[in-house]
Amino acid sequence: MNKINIAIDGPAAAGKSTIAKRVAEALSMIYVDTGAMYRAITLAHLEQPETEIDKLVDHIDLKLVNRSGQRIYLNGSDVSDRIREHDVTLNVSRIASIESVRTKLVNLQQNMTANKGVVMDGRDIGTKVIPEAELKVYMVASVEERAERRLIDNRNRGIASTFEELKRDIERRDHLDMTREISPLTKAEDAIEIDTTGKSIEEVTAQIIELAKSAM
């Protein structure tokens, strides 16, 4: 079988990261969570609001480590849990729309996929980061289901939230992601759309694995 890259795009809480991790594990590929990278930059900005974002980005050290599940390090510190907190979630779409931030991270992400064998999820993977990916998937789900998933995830992390609050946050993020000037969330022309509403993790994972095997 030939080595391939798999691009998985879609809106917030569509199940991209959960599915992408499982697909990568099943196919012995490398998983890259680009959303975590943007969240880490957002956290850095929240912690140093007085520093111009362009200067901040130039001096940030980001590392993804696949050890007991992927961990992300910001300037040497493990921020994998901190970047999932509500203040980061509220600000990540705004920070991700800044040109200098996207330029730095897209360059990093493209370097990661140069040797293939990568499953990468995000908002612009199939359209901007690796438009030449052998398999492109665009995952969607209803706003209600995505809010419920995020609610369960927050409970598991000990984060207080309500369904209505999360539904509003997701609708706001959808609008920001789809209307931003730089690399807006959009489906690549040759991407395969999968609606995960009402489907199990196992069902969607199996579907993408079969698509990947056909592309190898």
UniProtKB/Swiss-Prot annotation:
Keywords of the record: ATP-binding, Cytoplasm, Kinase, Nucleotide-binding, Transferase
Top-rank taxon, per record: Bacteria
MF (Gene Ontology): ATP binding; CMP kinase activity; dCMP kinase activity
Chief localization: cytoplasm
Tagged with keyword RNA-binding: no
GO biological process, one term: nucleobase-containing small molecule interconversion
Compartments it resides in: Cytoplasm
GO cellular component, one term: cytosol
Gene3D superfamilies found in the cross-reference section: P-loop containing nucleotide triphosphate hydrolases
Keyword Disulfide bond applies: no
Record: residues binding ATP: G10, P11, A12, A13, A14, G15, K16, S17, T18
SUPFAM superfamilies: P-loop containing nucleoside triphosphate hydrolases
Top-level enzyme category: transferase
Listed EC numbers: 2.7.4.25
Reaction equation(s) it catalyzes: CMP + ATP = CDP + ADP; dCMP + ATP = dCDP + ADP
NCBIfam families, alphabetized: cmk (TIGR00017)
Family in the record: Belongs to the cytidylate kinase family. Type 1 subfamily.
Protein name per Swiss-Prot or TrEMBL: Cytidylate kinase
Phylogenetic lineage: Bacteria, Bacillati, Bacillota, Bacilli, Bacillales
